């Protein structure tokens, strides 16, 4: 973080979507103005097998996020870096056994309450 700050980067956008990050089921659907857009349809993945990591619970993700925030936010404060957590995309309960926790306003309030700091924020995407 210190090196990022030295070169003028003052915000780090990160996500809490292990294994399967941004997921899409279609990458070329027609959109407005003849644009091609990505989409996600839960029906297309709901019966797919779990990943090789099996089931990852919300409890585990919250424990890991709490550990991360308590370790990293103080360093961000020292470095003058702002952390911005990206919402889960798509905002579904789980994908192939991997839970999603950053899907609601209440979840972001909980995240902010774990380590209240102006350096602990969210990405508006």
Question: Model regions: which residues?
Answer:
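Acidic/histidine-rich catalytic cores of soluble enzymes
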Residues: 49-125
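Active-site-proximal, glycine-rich beta->alpha crossover segments in alpha/beta enzymes
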Residues: 2-67
């Amino acid at each position: 973080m210190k090196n990022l700050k030295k070169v003028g980067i003052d915000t780090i956008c990160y996500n809490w979507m292990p294994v399967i990050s941004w997921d899409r089921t279609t990458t070329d659907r027609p959109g407005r103005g003849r644009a091609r857009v990505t989409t996600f349809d839960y029906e297309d993945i709901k019966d797919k097998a779990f990943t090789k990591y099996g089931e990852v619970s919300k409890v585990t993700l919250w424990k890991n996020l709490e550990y991360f925030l308590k370790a990293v936010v103080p360093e961000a404060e020292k470095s003058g870096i702002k952390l911005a957590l990206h919402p889960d995309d798509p905002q579904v309960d789980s994908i192939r056994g991997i839970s999603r926790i950053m899907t609601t306003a209440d979840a972001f309030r909980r995240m902010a309450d774990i380590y209240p700091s102006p350096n602990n924020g969210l990405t508006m995407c």
